[in-house]
Amino acid sequence: MTLTKAEMSEYLFDKLGLSKRDAKELVELFFEEIRRALENGEQVKLSGFGNFDLRDKNQRPGRNPKTGEDIPITARRVVTFRPGQKLKSRVENASPKDE
């Protein structure tokens, strides 16, 4: 099962009594703020959850799997997520759900 933004909005609607429009806007604003911070090169720390970091990867040699031809993989910036200790602990201790 996958948790979607629509399901998050529905949860806020049910639990907090927000209108569906306000719940959807709150979820969108939350993720937009994370996107904005990362686009500006900032780290995002969510206490009790984890950190979103930016990492610069250097150019490196690669290979086309179909032709075997050597090709360079260009340098790029990637987003990484490191879960916090509380999240790690809760996930490790959670009982698995059947899908």
Curated annotation (Swiss-Prot):
One of its GO terms (biological process) is regulation of translation. Keywords: DNA recombination, DNA-binding, Transcription, Transcription regulation, Translation regulation. GO terms for cellular component: cytosol. InterPro entries: Hist_DNA-bd (IPR000119), Histone-like_DNA-bd_CS (IPR020816), IHF-like_DNA-bd_dom_sf (IPR010992), IHF_alpha (IPR005684). One of its GO terms (molecular function) is structural constituent of chromatin. Residues 49-72 are annotated as: Disordered. Pfam families: Bac_DNA_binding. This protein is one of the two subunits of integration host factor, a specific DNA-binding protein that functions in genetic recombination as well as in transcriptional and translational control. Belongs to the bacterial histone-like protein family. NCBIfam families: himA, PRK00285.1. Heterodimer of an alpha and a beta chain. This is Integration host factor subunit alpha. It comes from Escherichia coli O9:H4 (strain HS).
